Curated annotation (Swiss-Prot):
<comment type="similarity">
    <text>Belongs to the PlsX family.</text>
</comment>
<keyword id="KW-0443">Lipid metabolism</keyword>
<dbReference type="InterPro" id="IPR012281">
    <property type="entry name" value="Phospholipid_synth_PlsX-like"/>
</dbReference>
<dbReference type="GO" id="GO:0006633">
    <property type="term" value="P:fatty acid biosynthetic process"/>
</dbReference>
<dbReference type="GO" id="GO:0043811">
    <property type="term" value="F:phosphate:acyl-[acyl carrier protein] acyltransferase activity"/>
</dbReference>
<keyword id="KW-0444">Lipid biosynthesis</keyword>
<comment type="subunit">
    <text>Homodimer. Probably interacts with PlsY.</text>
</comment>
<dbReference type="GO" id="GO:0005737">
    <property type="term" value="C:cytoplasm"/>
</dbReference>
<dbReference type="Pfam" id="PF02504">
    <property type="entry name" value="FA_synthesis"/>
</dbReference>
<comment type="function">
    <text>Catalyzes the reversible formation of acyl-phosphate (acyl-PO(4)) from acyl-[acyl-carrier-protein] (acyl-ACP). This enzyme utilizes acyl-ACP as fatty acyl donor, but not acyl-CoA.</text>
</comment>
<comment type="pathway">
    <text>Lipid metabolism; phospholipid metabolism.</text>
</comment>
<protein>
    <recommendedName>
        <fullName>Phosphate acyltransferase</fullName>
        <ecNumber>2.3.1.274</ecNumber>
    </recommendedName>
</protein>
<keyword id="KW-0594">Phospholipid biosynthesis</keyword>
<dbReference type="GO" id="GO:0008654">
    <property type="term" value="P:phospholipid biosynthetic process"/>
</dbReference>
<keyword id="KW-0963">Cytoplasm</keyword>
<keyword id="KW-1208">Phospholipid metabolism</keyword>
<dbReference type="InterPro" id="IPR003664">
    <property type="entry name" value="FA_synthesis"/>
</dbReference>
């Protein structure tokens, strides 16, 4: 039985949405047990509307929340915050992994102090899985865990993501690119130039050079490494572009009776494309580099987003990804 700690507090839509997602997800997975962390009264009220088998969950009651307006200093001030208690369950090995949609800065800071980083990892990075045109997934990191990074950080991201792609996504021949403003070797700031030189030297990394942001969704590169500031801008630009494009397509095909008839013929194709590039189906990001399986979902997560993050968390647990990353970094096998 796999155990996941779910911080149900702190998201924009509240605990009811998180509990509804948990209720639906656990019915699809007989090998899963959840620890629901948060305000006990809220959780019990939500469970009345979205029941879960009593043998498949327990509640860890907390009295505090670090919401989106909170500060990283709250990780010291609010010892009984749900996000703190959830991470402590991972540290104490009472669960196999955790997820939250709470305050990102508090999550990153608390993970650093409570769990710590793997050997030789200075800064953990957020890594989502992004859909692409080749019906595969692209890994992009860091997408916002850090505002500044060093070449050593990006090298470690490439190594860890390569292990993740091999073990979780089952592709041992992943290509790795460096996000930059051009494909030429000389492009970029000193960070990109130094990182490029070091990536070229790695024998176990299939480095293909610089990648521009317009190529992120093409699927031509499996793993794209970048600093957290640039990565966050890139991620949100991709999500926003996909959302606007799908909205505009829907608007156009429903603007007249003739177009609506034509759309009926292509309905399945439109649905497939919409599902592929809907970020809610890929809403989670693992905090790669800490001593535990820790996922962050969007603060605006709805039921579908939470279920996607639960699925990603469970996949990482089943593939024992943190232990494999730790061993891979030590042995330099990937």
């Amino acid at each position: 039985m796999y155990k996941i700690a779910f911080d149900v507090m702190g998201s924009d839509l509240g605990s009811l949405t998180a509990i509804k997602a948990a209720s639906e997800f656990i019915k699809e997975h007989n090998d899963l047990y959840l620890i629901l962390v948060g305000d006990e009264t809220e959780i019990k009220t939500a469970l009345e509307q979205n029941p879960i088998d009593k043998n498949k969950y327990e509640i860890l009651p907390t009295t505090q929340v670090i919401d989106m307006n909170g500060s990283i200093l709250d990780i010291r001030r609010k010892k009984d915050a749900s996000i703190i208690r959830t991470l402590e369950l991972v540290r104490d090995q009472k669960v196999d992994g955790m997820l939250t949609a709470g305050n990102s800065a508090a999550f990153i800071g608390a993970a650093h102090f409570i769990l710590g980083e793997l050997n030789n990892i200075v800064r953990a990075g957020f890594m989502p899985t992004m859909p692409n045109a080749k019906n595969k997934l692209t890994l992009l990191l860091d997408v916002g865990a850090n505002s500044e990074n060093t070449p050593e950080d990006l090298i470690n991201y490439a190594k860890m993501a390569n292990i993740y792609y091999t073990e979780v996504l089952k592709n041992p021949n992943a290509t790795v690119g460096l996000l930059n403003i051009g494909t030429e070797k000389s492009k970029g700031l000193e960070l990109q130039k130094q990182t490029f030189k070091q990536l070229e030297k790695l024998k176990n990394i299939n480095f293909v050079g610089n990648v521009e942001s317009r190529d992120v969704l093409t699927g031509n590169v499996d793993i794209i490494v970048t600093d957290g500031y640039s990565g966050n801008i890139c991620l949100k630009a991709c999500e926003g572009a996909a959302k606007v494009l799908l909205t505009e397509i829907k608007k156009e095909i429903t603007s007249s009776f003739i177009r609506k008839l034509a759309a009926l013929v292509l309905k399945k194709s439109f649905k497939n494309v919409a599902a592929k590039f809907d970020y809610k189906n890929h809403a989670g990001a693992i905090l790669l580099g800490v001593k535990g399986i820790c996922f962050k979902s969007h603060g605006s997560s709805d039921v579908r987003s939470f279920k996607a993050t639960l699925r990603m968390t469970l996949d990482a647990i089943k593939n024992n990804i943190v232990e494999k990353i730790e061993k891979g970094l030590i042995k330099n096998e990937y």
